């Protein structure tokens, strides 16, 4: 499941690039808010930063008095192979790796100031930081500003409410897991993190309770009532953490040494020794990673449903956006048609002009389709036990006399149904390749670069045609499979019958053996031979149908419907394609980017699920 966390990381970063980080004011639908995440919540001086650094095993977070975290920090941890060097990357600094983590701390401070200024303001725009290390687990955490009770000098009077509002906007989402940090040397009833968590998650289904500063509690006291859930019950077990002391921080005590000291503390503690295996920052990180993987897997269907609904809404909005009035309709139509022809030429070159597109399509037919058919579970369907059951069910109360024809037919039909999967997968794979070639051809058509609106229209029209071609192709390939089920090749079994009779004359079989396991194995062998023959046929006919319905049609009529529409358009419509006012163009481009994000996310999620 590790690849699912990586997938969500990728989508989160893509969301930020297009301006989707939740709570948008422009009323565009948000994918960010639907993605499972772990938000780290705690009051000032709760040990929140120390917990994060313990999980990472590095000093990298800004420290100081007052409000230090003033923007959400999306911290994506990537486990690497042992022996590789720790490094960090920021989304806003492409192709730059940090190996000095003191510079990471400074860049967080600088990037915060670039948006908020140096006057202690806060911003909901997140900073994305990826850390690659063999000492971490695959995990994504969102570090939020610490909850506070008073404003410091230079901050607006509303800072307390502003921070709580920002934190609440994250943790109130049903897909957000809450990592609530509370110091053990304070009454849990006064914990800012637990107070907010209880308001948004009253049952405690999404909340992880973390107790810090266990080693700083008054002598003779412990936190067992909290850890064991007697004081505050949550769905998940509480985890105790022992952070570095301020003296350790001042001395730059290595985080690996701190981890070892933490383990030793719990292992030797008279209060917590029996809980040592489920205490500490290392255990917390593994627990969060495992849970996040599970939550992502359970949420995939709802995320896909949301993506599909939002795609429909965005496509409707793109169709409805108004455009300015044009002047010379004839010249504009001529220009548009010329750009369309240039796009179609490049698209065809991708298919059969020595470009990689045609080779990728051939690869689907030459490798993917045969491989998928070879992996079909015919062995399970034609196992001795399965054959006996199906033949017996087909015979009913009267066993067959010579050959179980009904049993044969049911076995064959059941086997043939398995071919539908590879057939559908081939159609969808070609569809994705053609859509990608459309995007590439649009990007490579120089004439279109001045007109983002026309680019969007052409992509939408081409994809609409490709969707129709896919529907026809899907019908055709499934019809090929259904045809094999509708009428079996009788001569194949007649030849088998003659061969069987000849073998019987040369080596007579007793009546008892005729209905024993050998008899049913022979049936399975005959059906398997027939299925092999059908497979060889479909490996040849499915590519023919797909090329005829999808590839050939894409070359011949990709923009036919668009041409029919544009030729009947009046000057106003043509002007809308070539010239928009800035506000409408900005809105259209925002919608187009969000639509592209959703479609890419859907394809990537589908691909990840398909691989599984």
Curated annotation (Swiss-Prot):
N-acetylmethionine modified-residue sites: 1
InterPro entries: Dynamin, Dynamin_GTPase, Dynamin_GTPase_CS, Dynamin_N, Dynamin_stalk, G_DYNAMIN_dom, GED, GED_dom
One Gene Ontology term of the molecular function aspect: GTPase activity
Encoding gene per record: DRP1D
Record's protein name: Phragmoplastin DRP1D
EC category: hydrolase
Region called G3 motif, residue ranges: 143-146
Catalytic reactions of this protein: GTP + H2O = GDP + phosphate + H(+)
GO cellular component terms, A-Z: cytoplasm; microtubule
Subcellular location: Cytoplasm; Cytoplasm, Cytoskeleton
Keywords, comma-separated and alphabetical: Acetylation, Cytoplasm, Cytoskeleton, GTP-binding, Hydrolase, Microtubule, Motor protein, Nucleotide-binding
Binding residues for GTP: 45-50, 213-218, 243-246
């Amino acid at each position: 499941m590790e690849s699912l966390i990586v997938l969500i990381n990728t989508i989160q970063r893509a969301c930020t690039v297009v301006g989707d980080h939740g709570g948008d004011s422009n009323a565009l639908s948000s994918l960010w808010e639907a993605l499972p995440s772990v938000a780290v919540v705690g009051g000032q001086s709760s040990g929140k930063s120390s917990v994060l650094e313990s999980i990472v095993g590095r000093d990298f977070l800004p420290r100081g008095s007052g409000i230090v975290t003033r923007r959400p920090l999306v911290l994506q941890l990537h486990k690497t192979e042992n022996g590789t060097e720790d490094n960090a990357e920021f989304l806003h600094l492409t192709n730059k790796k940090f190996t000095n983590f003191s510079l990471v701390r400074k860049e967080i401070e600088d990037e915060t100031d670039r948006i908020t200024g140096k006057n202690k303001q806060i911003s909901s725009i997140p900073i994305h930081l990826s850390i690659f290390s063999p000492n971490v687990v695959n995990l994504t955490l969102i570090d939020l500003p610490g909850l506070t009770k008073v404003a410091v000098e230079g901050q607006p009077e509303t800072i307390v409410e502003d921070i709580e509002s920002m934190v609440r906007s994250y943790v109130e989402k049903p897909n957000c897991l809450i990592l609530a940090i509370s110091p053990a040397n304070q009454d849990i009833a006064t914990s800012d993190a637990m107070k907010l968590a209880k308001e948004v998650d009253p049952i405690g289904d999404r909340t992880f309770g973390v107790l810090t500063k266990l080693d700083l509690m008054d002598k003779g006291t412990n936190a067992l009532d909290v850890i064991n859930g007697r004081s505050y019950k949550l769905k998940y077990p509480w985890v105790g953490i022992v952070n570095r002391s301020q003296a350790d921080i001042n001395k730059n005590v290595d985080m690996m040494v701190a981890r070892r000291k933490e383990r030793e503390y719990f292992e030797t503690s008279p209060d917590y020794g029996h809980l040592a295996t489920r205490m500490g920052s290392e255990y917390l990180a593994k627990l969060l990673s495992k849970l996040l993987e599970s939550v992502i897997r359970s949420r995939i269907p709802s995320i896909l449903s949301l993506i599909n609904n939002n795609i429909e809404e965005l496509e409707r909005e793109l169709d409805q956006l108004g455009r300015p009035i044009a002047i010379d309709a004839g010249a504009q139509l001529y220009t548009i048609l010329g750009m369309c022809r240039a796009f179609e030429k490049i698209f065809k070159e991708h298919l059969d002009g020595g470009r990689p597109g045609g080779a990728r399509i051939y690869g689907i037919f030459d490798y993917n389709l045969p491989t998928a058919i070879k992996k079909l579970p015919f062995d399970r369907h034609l196992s001795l036990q399965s054959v006996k059951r199906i033949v017996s069910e087909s015979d009913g109360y009267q066993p067959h006399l010579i050959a179980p024809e009904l049993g044969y037919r049911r076995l064959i039909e059941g086997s043939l149904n398995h071919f539908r999967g590879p057939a559908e997968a081939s159609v969808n794979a070609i569809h994705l390749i053609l859509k990608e070639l459309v995007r590439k051809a649009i990007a490579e058509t120089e004439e279109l670069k001045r007109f983002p609106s026309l680019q969007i229209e052409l992509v939408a029209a081409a994809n609409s045609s490709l969707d129709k071609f896919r529907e026809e192709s899907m019908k055709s390939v499934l019809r090929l499979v259904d045809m094999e089920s509708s009428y079996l090749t009788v001569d194949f079994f007649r030849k088998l019958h003659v061969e069987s009779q000849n073998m019987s004359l040369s080596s007579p079989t007793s009546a008892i053996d005729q209905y024993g396991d050998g008899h049913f194995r022979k049936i399975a062998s005959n059906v398997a031979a027939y299925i092999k023959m059908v497979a060889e046929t479909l490996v040849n006919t499915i590519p023919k149908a797909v090329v005829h319905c999808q590839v050939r049609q894409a070359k011949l009529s990709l923009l036919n419907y668009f041409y029919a529409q544009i030729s009947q358009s009046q000057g106003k419509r043509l002007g809308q394609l070539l010239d928009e006012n800035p506000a409408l163009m900005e809105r259209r481009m925002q919608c187009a980017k969000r639509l592209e994000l959703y479609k890419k996310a859907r394809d990537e999620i589908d691909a990840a699920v398909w691989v599984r």
